[in-house]
Structure formats: structure tokens, C-alpha cells
């Protein structure tokens, strides 16, 4: 069985909705999904540990955009993982990234690239969204070749669009397929 950690921070629920779409898709394919957050905000939240990363076969990682960068909670966590990096414990694990912003040009692509940096430093294999996912060409909201994204609106009231949901599902499917091939 493939074990996948879906790690996220969500301020207003958009990134959590994306994490759930990706998680549901992974579970549909038969993965053991471990949904994790950086801090416990609700009773059902499970906080990430470094052991979670060591034990997983693949990782999906997302936060809202913070001026084109990852949320501080995520950065703080990744800064504690030097011991994993020194031992090469995440090398060759497939990973993908996802993000949400308030506006169409609110920094999603920059954030997705920023989310990728610690994964690449750890030697993980970064998976994007290939253009055989037709929603990349049809979306009028979120979705990039760098990863799934969402445009929440200035009051964070936009629900995931059908295109954004399909892109999240495509990301989950691709992550599962690559992790399965590698295992």
C-alpha cells in the first residue's frame, strides 16, 4: 500500500478544501492517506511530525499564498528538517504542491515555486500538472502547470470551481500513480 501525506495550512478553508479533494482522490485509488497540518486549530487536526515524512511514500504540500511565499507555519516546520536532509531521508519521494490566493494574480504561481524549494532541497521528485489535463487550458480561475491552485476571492467566499477540483483530482491521481510505480 502507498502511504501519502497530504500536508497543508489553511487560513480560511480554501487550501483545506483542496487538500480534501487530493486526499479523497488518493483514497479512491487505494492509498493510505495521512492528512496533516502544521498546527492544531481544530480537534480533528493532526500535526505533522518528521516521522510522518520519513514513513510516507509521497507528499502533497499546500499553503495559501503569503506575498508569493508559503505560510510562515510551513516555513517554520521545514526549517526543522535539516536532520532529514543530512541523512537523505526524503530523496526520491514524489511530491506535488498546491496553493490558494485571494485574487487571480495574487501570487499562486510564485507560491507554488516557493513551496517547491524545500522539497527539491530534500531531493524529492517534484510533479507538476501536465497539459494532458484539459482543465489547465479551460480554467478561468486556478490551475497551473506548477501545481493545483485556487482563487478564493477578496472575501475568501469562492468555492473550488469544477476546473480547480478536476485539477486537484488529476494531481492526486498522478501522485498516486508515480508513487505506485516507484514502490
What are these regions (language model features)?
Residues 98-100, 153-156:
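Short, local alpha-helical segments
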Residues 94-141:
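Short, glycine-/small-residue-rich phosphate/pyrophosphate-handling segment
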Residues 8-9, 67, 77, 98, ...:
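Aromatic side chains
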Residues 64, 70, 108-109, 130, ...:
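Gly/Ser/Thr-rich beta-alpha loop segments that engage phosphate groups in nucleotides
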Residues 113, 143-145, 162:
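Glycine-rich phosphate-binding loop at the start of an alpha helix
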Residues 1-90, 154-183:
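N-terminal beta1-alpha1-beta2 submodule of the flavodoxin-like/Rossmannoid cofactor-binding fold
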Residues 137-152:
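Short glycine/proline-rich, acidic loop/turn segments that cap or connect secondary-structure elements
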Residues 79-82, 86, 103, 121, ...:
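Alpha-helix boundary/capping detector
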Amino acid at each position: 500500500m502507498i502511504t501519502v501525506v497530504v500536508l497543508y495550512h489553511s487560513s480560511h478553508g480554501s487550501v483545506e478544501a483542496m487538500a480534501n479533494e487530493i486526499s479523497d482522490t488518493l483514497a479512491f485509488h487505494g492509498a493510505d492517506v495521512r492528512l496533516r497540518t502544521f498546527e492544531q486549530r481544530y480537534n480533528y487536526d493532526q500535526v505533522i511530525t518528521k516521522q510522518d515524512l520519513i514513513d510516507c511514500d509521497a507528499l502533497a504540500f499546500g499553503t495559501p499564498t503569503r506575498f508569493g511565499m508559503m505560510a510562515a507555519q510551513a516555513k517554520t516546520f521545514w526549517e526543522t528538517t535539516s536532520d532529514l536532509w543530512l541523512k537523505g531521508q526524503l530523496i526520491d519521494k514524489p511530491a506535488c504542491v498546491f496553493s490558494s490566493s485571494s485574487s487571480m494574480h495574487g501570487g499562486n504561481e510564485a507560491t507554488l515555486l516557493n513551496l517547491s524549494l524545500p522539497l527539491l532541497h530534500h531531493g524529492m521528485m517534484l510533479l507538476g500538472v501536465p497539459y494532458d489535463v484539459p482543465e489547465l487550458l479551460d480554467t478561468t480561475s486556478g490551475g497551473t502547470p506548477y501545481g493545483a491552485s485556487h482563487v478564493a476571492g477578496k472575501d475568501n467566499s469562492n468555492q473550488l470551481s469544477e476546473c480547480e477540483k478536476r485539477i486537484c483530482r488529476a494531481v492526486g491521481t498522478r501522485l498516486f500513480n508515480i508513487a505506485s510505480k516507484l514502490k
